Every structure is written in C-alpha cells, then in structure tokens.
A protein has these predicted regions:
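Bacterial Sec-dependent N-terminal signal peptides
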Residues: 2-6, 11-34, 405-407
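Extracellular beta-rich repeat passengers
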Residues: 30-63, 74-89, 94, 99-192, ...
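Active/ligand-binding-proximal structured segments within catalytic/core domains
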Residues: 71-72, 449-452
Length: 565
C-alpha cells in the first residue's frame, strides 16, 4: 500500500472510530434522564428528552446538549433538575434559530427545579458549602475554573419549592469560574429567582429574566463577575425585586466581598409597590448604563457596609435612569448614601425618568460609559439600556412576557378597559369591536405598536371616555399605527376622545359612535397624550347621516397634548 492510500485508509478508520464513539455517547431520546452521568454523554440535535428526577453530571464527565434539543421535566412526585457538579462540564451551545429549551409538561411557575452549575471559584460561605438543590459541593480557589459553555438556552417554569426557605431558580451559579462561557440565556415564568449567583467569578452576557415571581437577578456569597446586556421584565404582581444583591447575610464583611461590574441593563418592574435594585448585606457593585422603571422604590440601600462602599467610591452607580427615587433602609446607624449622592453631577444619573421603550424592553438612552475601558470583557456600548432599536438580540430564541415568541404574539382587543393597560410593540393587536377606556383608567400605547381592526360585521373603534386617558407617544422612527385588515376607506371606526371641556350642544351630548357622554365646564381637562399616530382607512358608515372620522375630539380640553397625527 502506498503512502497516499495508507493515509486515506487511516483517515477512514479514524472516522469510523469517531462515529462509533459518538454513537456510544448519544443518549437515546426514549431513555428517561435521571440519576448520575459519569462519562461523556450527548443529547442529540433536535431531539426531545424527558427528565424524570435529579440528573447529576459527575466530576470528569461532560454533558453535551446540541442545538434544538428540548428537555421536558415530567410532572410527577419527583424533584426534577439538572446539576453540573464540580469538575464536570456542560457543553450546551444552542443557536438563535435552534435554542436549547428546558421546560416542563406542566406550564406553570414552580413546575421543576431548573439548571444548576457548581464550580471551584472563590465564595465567602466557607469550605463546606452545599447547593440548595442536589446537596453538591461548590466553591474553591480557582477563579478561572471552567464549567463549560451555556449559549442560547431557555429555562421555563422553574422554581420548584422544597420548603418555605428553599426554592429552585431558573439558572443557579454556585462558585462558577470565569473560564465558563455564559451568554444568551432566558429564565422564563419561574416562581423563584430567574438567575442567582452564589459567589464565583463567572462573566455573563445577554441574559433575560422574564416574569419570575421572586427576584429577576440575585447574587450573594461574593460574586465578583462581569455582566452586560441584561434584561428583567416583570408582569405578575407577585414579582419581587428586579435585582436583590447581598454579600453575606451572616457576615456582611465576609471575603471575597460581592462586587460584580454590570453595564447596559434594562429593568422593567410590574408597576406595583416594591424595589427595583436592592443593595444590602454588605454587597459592593459597579452598575453603569442602566434603566430602571416600574417600581415604586427604584433603588434602595441597606446596611452600613453597602452604603459605605457607595459613599467612598468603592461601589459606583453611573449613567442610571430611575423612574422613582433612591431610599435608604439602613437600620444600623445614620444614612451614609442618599438621593443627593446618587444625583451628584459626576454620576450622570437621573430620577423621575419616564421610559420610552418599545415592547417594554427595547430602547436606549444616548450617552453613557464605555465599559470596555474597565475590562476587555465589555463591548463598547456607551448608552443606557440593554436592547437598542434595530439590534434585537432576543429575536427568534426568547419568549415575550405573554409567552409569544419575540417575533410577535397576537392579542384581541374588545370591550371595556377599567384598569391601566399597556399595549406593547411587537405584539399583534386585533381590534374586534368597540374598545372603551373607562373613567379612571389609562391606556398606554408604546412606540411602534400596530392595532389592526378586523374585517368583520362588527363596528370596530377605540374610544377614550370622560375621565379616562390615553398615553400614546409614538416617535418619528416608531409611530403608532391604527389600521384595518381591509385596506379601504370606511373600513373601521377610528379613534375617539371624550373630554369635559365646554361645548354648546347641551348637557346630554353623546358621541356619534359608542354613545359616550362628552362636554363639561373644564377647559383644561386632560385626556392624555397623542403623538406620532397614524389612523388609516377610518370613516365607517353607520347610516346615511353618520360616519366615523379618523380622529374625533368630543369636548377635549387643552390639558391634552396632541401633535404629529
């Protein structure tokens, strides 16, 4: 055999061995996932697997999860979870078009135990720390420890409750080192935290915590990693803090002291009472280029160690935009950091910011810190916020807050709105009748939202009644569009605003559409804001004498803002 033929034969033999090795390592989708993995194993691309208990990847073994794999936790009496132990690895590389999905057959918060990684990086919880789930050791002396790769993964419906004190998160990092690659992860619809770090040095990018009913992001026990492009979005009234940050509850000054460096965050609360960013228990932090909205207490500080670090510059909060104020809950002594410190000129911070975000999370504020000057891990993104318009890194692999793909869900609009409601861009809204915003309620319509009237036998229209408000602030780049499936004049009934300003038609005046009262004695009545809105194909004919306009203003007062329509 000549040399060329020998090489070809050797290559073919090696390929055959390689295929045999892979086939040996691939787990059959018919086999339930439970117990210990002690050798390298593969979950094959595009396959669906069933998790029926705790799955531990043991030291020396690697679990490879290929793109498009779905793992479904069984709704049974077992505690289902996946745990990567110290010295083991996970190689889970999904893609934007084929994410890895870990979910449950019971589509409810708290259905299963989530994904847990245990590493050998430093923590401040002692030498015998054990994971809250699986009783696995974590922590050590190797900040560069490598637990593998996590990319384009969605964990849904985590947060299994073990006791009143212990619930499993979506993603949990126990002493994970910065040799581990972590980006493009979403924790969706869980009953505990979306993401939690127990010490470690792991760096993270492109994280989304969506409607997790405890904290969106949580750290403790000395986490000292970096994070960039992180989104929290809360809908449920049960949701707690957007960020809950601790060093160590038992010893606030335990070392290493938690000191993550974070940039480009968009944190959107549920509009209820509660905290946005909660810094406490001695934690330090550097947070830059961040938007916080939807919480009555956007930033709170607690404990002397935490406030001292802010006051002396060890911790830094810069280029941060808060919808509400800064408050101290420090019960250990005098307040060491307050809103005046937060608003100092060199911090470039703002309180009272009104968010102009598309789909609740998309949008940025120009101007910010180039965090790449702090560490090469960071991209140069000198703006506040995580998701710039025109660069939707969530597209295709993540879910929206209502469970639709980021390509857009469909929601029907009809009847009465009696409480504040927000229409989000990216969601397909179909108007299938009269939509009345009732007294005391505000309808907020975000930039870029499209409302489409259905082509049917029902009269479709949108009406803001007396005492109600509309807050519809489109932009030149992202106007609000109200249109019809049937692209013809007279297809639907248009937009109608009823106010309490003077009219000369008497005290019993009613709108031509919707039979709503209008007129009064308040020339300064305020029905809200209308900016950059396009109404298309209005003018529905009720009779020979009555047709609906595009925009109709019934006794609207001059407290209302109207432009660019």
């Amino acid at each position: 055999m000549n040399k060329k033929l020998f090489i070809l034969a050797l290559g073919a033999a090696m390929t055959a061995v390689s295929c045999q090795e892979r086939n040996k390592n691939v787990i059959d989708p018919e086999v339930d996932l439970i117990g210990d993995i002690t050798e390298d194993r593969i979950l094959e691309e595009g396959q669906t697997y069933t998790l029926t208990g705790g799955l531990h990847v043991k030291e020396g073994a690697t679990l490879t999860i290929e793109p498009g794999v779905t793992i479904i936790a069984q709704d049974d009496n077992q505690v289902d979870y996946i745990l990567i132990e110290q010295g083991a690895k996970i190689d889970a590389r999904g893609t934007a078009s084929a994410p890895i999905v870990m979910t449950s057959n019971r589509k409810e918060a708290g259905a299963w135990g989530g994904l847990h990684i245990c590493g050998k990086a430093p923590i401040n919880a002692g030498t015998d720390a054990k994971s809250e789930i699986g009783d696995a050791s974590y922590g050590g002396n190797d900040p560069a420890d490598n637990s593998g790769v996590l990319q384009y993964i969605r964990v849904e419906y985590g947060g299994f409750t073990f006791s009143e004190e212990k619930e499993a998160n979506g993603f949990t990092f126990y002493g994970v080192g910065n040799g581990t690659t972590v980006d493009h992860l979403q924790a969706y619809g869980g009953s505990d935290d979306g993401f939690e770090w127990f010490g470690g040095t792991v760096n993270v990018k492109y994280l989304i915590s969506t409607n997790n009913t405890d904290d969106s992001f949580d750290w403790t026990e000395g986490w000292c990693g970096n994070g960039q492009f992180m989104i929290a979005q809360q809908i449920s009234e049960e949701c707690d803090a957007l960020i809950e940050a601790d060093n160590n509850d038992n010893d606030n000054m335990a070392e290493p002291i938690s000191h993550p460096v974070l940039s480009n965050l968009t944190l959107v609360g549920n509009g209820a009472d509660g905290r946005g960013i909660r810094l406490r228990a001695g934690t330090q932090a550097e947070i830059y280029n961040t938007i916080v909205t939807g919480k009555s207490r956007a930033l709170t500080t607690e404990t002397e160690g935490t406030e001292s670090a802010l006051a002396n510059g060890t911790s830094k909060l810069q280029y941060i935009y808060l919808s509400s104020g800064v408050s101290s809950d420090n019960e250990e002594g005098s307040v060491l950091y307050d809103q005046n410190d937060f608003l100092a000129n060199d911090n470039h911070n703002e309180v009272g910011y009104t968010a102009q975000l598309t789909n609740s999370i998309m949008g940025t504020i120009d101007g910010g810190l180039d965090a790449s000057g702090i560490d090469s891990f960071f991209d140069n993104a000198a703006y506040a916020g995580a998701l710039p318009s025109g660069n939707d890194w969530t597209s295709g692999w993540a879910l929206t807050a209502d469970g639709g793909s980021t390509g857009g869900a469909t929601v029907e609009l009809e009847g009465d709105i009696t409480e504040d409601m927000t229409l989000q861009a990216g969601v397909n809204y179909t108007l299938i009748g009269g939509l009345h915003v009732k007294e005391g309620a505000t309808l907020t319509i975000e930039p870029g939202t499209v409302i489409t009237a259905q082509d049917d036998d029902i009269v479709d229209y949108l009406l803001i009644e007396q005492g109600a408000k509309i807050d519809a602030r489109g932009t030149a780049d992202n106007p609000i569009v109200m249109t019809s499936e049937r692209k013809e004049a007279g297809s639907w009934g248009g937009l109608h605003i009823c106010g309490k300003a003077p009219i000369n038609a008497g005290s019993g005046a009613k709108s031509e559409i919707g039979d709503a009262s209008y007129g009064g004695n308040d020339p300064h009545d305020n029905s809200g804001t209308l900016q950059y809105i396009r109404v298309e194909y209005g003018g529905y004919a009720f009779s020979e004498e009555k047709e609906a306009n595009g925009f109709t203003f019934y006794g609207v007062g001059n407290g209302t803002t109207v432009d660019h329509l």
